[in-house]
């Protein structure tokens, strides 16, 4: 019973630390609300949406789509940019593009939006939740390296989960609240364990790593 009480207290403390870290990361200004789980449209966005509706331009060929893609390329310095209906569909397409299929496992951070897990399920893969760190709220790569070293082996060039016997084919990180993951450690992990990488940067637009 004492052991159970200890673990409950420990988990509660961890949960409180996570919440505290999130609140600090938001860095709210006085009287400024930061919307997280509800839509928020300012006057400019409402005006642009009204223009689209009035001009009957609300499809993939809408006149703002190309402008949006060009601005994304400019901001991110990416060679290509393709707009999708939402972030979930973008993750789904990314998994298909790198050849993820049924029975593959995808590593995703435990603190996450449901889109990551859903995208894995759409292609028949299994989301494999991994630890995060309090500093960035992203993947704890130190713990991940220890975990993979202990619980996986290589077979036919793939990192194989010893317990499930399924190949771990990729890692899908998320830059939570705009805090970039430690990409230096990420590169070491994907190289050592032969993983493909997808970055969910929906919350990281405008953030840069070093």
Predicted ranges, named:
Residues 76, 209-210:
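Structural motif
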Residues 2-97, 101, 169, 173, ...:
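Conserved PLP-binding active-site segment in aminotransferase class I/II-type PLP enzymes
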Residues 58-61, 153, 210:
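Short, flexible helix-adjacent loops and helix caps
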Residues 96, 100-192, 196-208:
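PLP-dependent aminotransferase-like
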């Amino acid at each position: 019973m004492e052991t159970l009480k200890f673990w409950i207290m420990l988990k509660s403390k961890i949960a409180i630390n996570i919440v505290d870290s999130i609140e600090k990361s938001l860095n709210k200004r006085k009287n400024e609300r930061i919307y997280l789980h509800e839509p928020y449209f300012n006057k400019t966005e409402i005006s642009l949406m009204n223009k689209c509706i009035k001009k009957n331009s609300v499809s993939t060929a809408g006149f703002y789509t190309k402008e949006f893609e060009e601005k994304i390329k400019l901001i991110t310095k990416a060679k290509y940019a393709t707009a999708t209906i939402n972030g979930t569909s973008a993750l789904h397409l990314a998994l298909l593009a790198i050849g993820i299929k049924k029975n593959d496992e995808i590593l995703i951070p435990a603190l996450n939006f449901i889109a990551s897990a859903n995208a894995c399920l759409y292609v028949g893969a299994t989301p494999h939740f991994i630890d995060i760190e309090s500093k960035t709220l992203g993947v704890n790569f130190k713990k991940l390296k220890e975990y993979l070293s202990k619980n996986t082996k290589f077979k036919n060039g793939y990192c194989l989960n010893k317990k499930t016997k399924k190949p771990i084919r990729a890692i899908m990180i998320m830059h939570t609240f705009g805090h970039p993951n430690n990409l230096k450690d990420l590169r070491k992990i994907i190289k050592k364990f032969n993983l493909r990488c997808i970055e969910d940067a929906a919350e990281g637009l405008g953030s840069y790593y070093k």
